[in-house]
Amino acid sequence: MDKFTTLEGVAAPLKIINVDTDMIIPKQYLKTIKRTGLGKGLFSEQRYNDDGSENPDFILNKPAYRGAKILVAGDNFGCGSSREHAPWALLDFGIRCVISTSFGDIFYNNCFKNGVLPIRVEQADLDRLFDDAERGSNATVTIDLPNQEIRGPDGGTVKFEIDPFRKHCLINGLDDIGLTLEKKASIDSYEAKAKTERAWA
């Protein structure tokens, strides 16, 4: 998992509440267990018309937001069914941070496990971030995870809270496997000691 320290880029404003995981990545893309290639399915029912052509009105199809690294979204983002493909799709598209007032619990947890930072903010702060994001490629937003703050294009800051353990994992690029490997020396020491003390086992 790639480390997450500071992220600077365009933020796309998605002013829709209750965006569920089926909207993020429709069910037809769930057949794969690969984490790559799912960016094409991200919001596919909104990004594409029935004939497969792009919907020019959808935010991520607009020139200013095609390379967005941050998504500013309405309340209750990622609600609905459990599917780890949702953060996979965001990450494969290039989005490493989602900002909202609240998230679906399972989606929220899955984001941390896959290197995507979900940030909860108050509604007033979200409204300010929406205003910043609507300026498109003329304005960039910076996510400073070590200092736990969002910096807008005009220098304004929004502080955010994050669990210290989850912060540690993101900064150091540790997923579940990485966490286990981090303890490898202790595990090896325990196993060597156990073999000596219980040679009969």
UniProtKB/Swiss-Prot annotation:
Pathway in which the depicted protein is active: Amino-acid biosynthesis; L-leucine biosynthesis; L-leucine from 3-methyl-2-oxobutanoate: step 2/4
Family matches, as SUPFAM superfamilies: LeuD/IlvD-like
Alphabetized Pfam families for the sequence: Aconitase_C
Task performed by this protein: Catalyzes the isomerization between 2-isopropylmalate and 3-isopropylmalate, via the formation of 2-isopropylmaleate.
Species of the source: Rhodopseudomonas palustris (strain BisA53)
Cellular component terms (Gene Ontology): 3-isopropylmalate dehydratase complex
Coiled-coil residue spans: none
Entry EC no(s): 4.2.1.33
GO biological process assignments: L-leucine biosynthetic process
Protein name: 3-isopropylmalate dehydratase small subunit
Sequence similarity: Belongs to the LeuD family. LeuD type 1 subfamily.
Catalysed reactions listed for this entry: (2R,3S)-3-isopropylmalate = (2S)-2-isopropylmalate
Entry keywords, A to Z: Amino-acid biosynthesis, Branched-chain amino acid biosynthesis, Leucine biosynthesis, Lyase
A GO molecular-function annotation: 3-isopropylmalate dehydratase activity
Superkingdom of source: Bacteria
Oligomeric form and interacting partners: Heterodimer of LeuC and LeuD.
